[in-house]
Regions:
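Thiamine diphosphate
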Residues: 1-26, 35, 41-450, ...
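Gly/Ser/Thr-rich loops at beta-strand to alpha-helix junctions
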Residues: 33-35, 142-145, 278-282, 319-320, ...
Length: 642
């Protein structure tokens, strides 16, 4: 492994020991990595771990003094100050340092034994309501120790010059071959290997056997330990929808009932957890706290809510990096879970998702690597309704980022209501080896599909909504498409306006749940075949597409399709603290702008469209005046019904 992006070793280790009470995860942290934000925050995860129900992380901070070309901060801190720092973080540091390689091995072995003994004592004596102080090791060695001391009269060992490739041997530098050979011979290979180049038997005997070998530890190949979740029938958690739009429900709140019972059904297995940066209640997962608590091993006060030394929710550390890192460690060691986040702030872990996608890509080519549970994201508190928050909280770009990853790895779902959300979540939490992204509403919203129809719709991934379409048996004049909860409402409202004004106008209404259905089947396994796509979207009719995110993403996904008469409305990077409907108006996703745009491409209407066009423009002016005076949306917007 060439290393690369740093900062997550400790959070991975802490995720690995969750619900693994007999596991000790020794985690080597380079002093360069220790300077990253995520790693610096990770030292405090010892306040989350419960030594009665979880394993123990043994950090080994390796101070070799240098990064690529600079000294490291931790190596230039006086030792007494360094020890105080880690004691302040709740650790008991042991410093290991020696001037000879033989001595360092002896000291390190002795210190490891001492740390293991200390961990065993902690495990045996810890009481439920008292946080323990865990051991850690600070290992000091010169950078490049054992390598060439000088090259071209410049010191290498013990300096930044020993980073990565200290000796370049190629046709431009043949003189360095002797230096390289001397370095390799310093390890005395003749004492290690026989004449056939095989490791000597007496040395082989020293190596651990079976699962005691690092690479054979089942925790390093988590699929070996994976147990399927006990999942209740999700159909029993749907909301009743007799007629589209009549029922009002909060999608994330209702999903919480389903997740609550997954927690209850797997309490004995202890293999399912929820991760999020202090947002479980904000994202309306309230009902999970009927079954569990937030895990917290720090000081607790009487007015704390849902805080306990043991709980299935990791929600008490305000760091997307740490929540994502712990979830990845939890999944990689054979368990299940998901991370939920404000949509805008999941961008903080963009690159972490990329690294996990790369890992999944490589593992697909390794037959010995067993399947693990998918990395599941739920994005809520999203761009279209921020209440007291504003422009800083508005960014749907995680979807653009995820789409760039390998097609056999990523999936994106935009359920328009409660029943489709529950169906999507059930699918994602059962899946393996994917990165699944669900974008979900948390506010009270109209409900469109009963559970039976929701299952069919999610299974297909997209489809024509009969109740909103009137093109039975003929080609439509207009395709009104949408993806996302808010765009669905506005697209339906626009459709209603058009149909009320032009009864002979044929509109086909299409809702997209699985965003990857829009891509060509050549590019993504979920993509529709061209014939299917053309049958649904037509080859040439105008398409008004109301989209949750940035409009360019829809154009990117559909650029190979025959019908390029596509006009996408989505987030245009306009926003502030304002009303819900005004957010849509500012970004031209509202019903009036959708109608105005549709009229441009409906040639059959001729001059008849002028009056409606003017009416919509006047409505937009009326809207601005109303919210300026009353600070809320017009009654006809707030009380709109299908």
């Amino acid at each position: 492994n060439e290393g690369g992006e740093l900062g997550y070793s400790l959070s991975h280790a802490f995720g690995a020991v969750l619900d693994n009470p007999d596991l000790i995860a020794a985690c080597v942290v380079g002093d360069g990595e220790a300077e990253t934000g995520p790693l610096a925050a990770s030292w405090h995860l010892n306040k989350i771990i419960n030594p009665l129900t979880d394993g123990i992380v043994l950090p080994i901070l390796h101070l070799n003094g240098y990064k690529i070309a600079n000294p490291t901060i931790y190596s230039r801190i006086p030792e007494d100050e360094l020890i105080k720092y880690f004691e302040g973080c709740g650790w008991n540091p042991y410093v290991v340092e020696a001037s000879s390689t033989a001595k360092i091995h002896e000291l390190m072995a002795r210190t490891l034994d001492r740390c293991i003994e200390e961990i065993k004592i902690i495990k045996s004596k810890t009481r439920l309501n008292k946080r323990a102080t865990f051991p850690m090791i600070i290992l000091k060695t010169p950078k490049g120790w054992g390598g060439p001391k000088f090259i071209n009269n410049l010191q290498v060992e013990g300096t930044f010059r020993s980073h990565q490739v200290p000796v370049v041997v190629n046709k431009e530098h043949p003189e360095n071959l002797e230096i390289l050979e001397a370095w390799l011979r310093s390890y005395k290979p003749e004492e290690l290997f026989d004449k056939n180049g095989t490791l000597k038997k007496e040395l082989k005997e020293l190596a651990p056997k079976g699962n005691h070998r690092m690479g054979m530890n089942p925790h390093a190949n988590g699929g070996l330990l994976l147990e399927e979740l006990n999942i209740p029938d999700f159909r029993g958690y749907g909301v009743e929808v007799k007629n589209p739009g009549e029922t009002i429900s909060q999608d994330m709140m209702e999903l919480g009932y389903f997740i609550r019972d997954i927690i209850r059904l797997n309490e004995n297995k202890k293999n399912f957890r929820i991760f999020g940066p202090d947002e479980a209640l904000s994202n309306r997962l309230n009902h999970v706290f009927e079954a569990t608590n937030r895990q917290w091993n720090g000081i607790r006060y009487d007015n704390d809510e849902f805080i306990s030394p043991y709980g299935r929710v990791i929600d008490s550390v305000l760091s997307e990096h740490l929540c994502e890192g712990m979830l990845e460690g939890y999944l990689l060691t054979g368990r299940h879970g998901f991370i939920h986040s404000y949509e805008a702030f999941i961008r903080i872990v963009d690159s972490m998702a990329s690294q996990h996608a790369k890992w999944l890509k490589v593992t697909k080519d390794l037959p010995w690597r067993r399947d693990i549970s998918s990395l599941n994201f739920i994005l809520s508190s999203y761009v279209w309704q921020q209440d007291h928050n504003g422009f800083t909280h508005q960014d749907p770009g995680f979807l653009n980022h995820i789409v760039t990853k390998k097609a056999d790895t990523v999936r994106i779902y935009l359920p328009p209501d409660t029943n489709t959300l529950i169906s999507c979540f059930d699918h994602c939490i059962r899946s393996k080896n994917y990165i699944n992204v669900i974008v979900a509403s948390k506010h009270p919203r109209p409900q469109w599909l009963n559970m039976s129809d929701a299952i069919k719709h999610c299974t297909k991934g997209l489809g024509r909504w009969d109740f909103a379409s009137n093109d039975e048996g003929c080609e439509p004049d207009l395709v009104m498409a949408c993806a996302g909860e808010t765009p669905t409402i506005e697209a339906l409202a626009a459709t209603k306006i058009l149909r009320e004004n032009f009864s002979d106008l044929k509109i086909r209404f299409i809702n997209v749940v699985d965003l990857m259905k829009l891509q060509s089947h050549e590019n993504h396994p979920h993509g529709l075949e061209d014939a299917e796509y053309d049958n649904l979207f037509t080859k040439d009719k105008p398409i008004i597409f109301a989209f949750h995110g940035y409009p360019n993403l829809i154009h990117e996904l559909t650029y190979k399709r025959h019908n390029q008469n596509m006009h996408v409305h989505g987030y245009l990077e306009e926003g502030t603290i304002t009303t819900t409907f005004d957010m849509k108006v500012q970004n031209k996703l509202d019903r009036y702008n959708l109608v105005i745009d549709a009229l441009k491409y409906l040639d059959k209407l001729g001059d008849k469209s002028s009056a409606l066009n003017e009416w919509c423009k006047n409505k937009l002016i009326e809207h601005k005046e109303y919210i300026k005076e009353y600070g809320e949306d017009m009654p006809e917007i707030k009380n709109w019904k299908w």
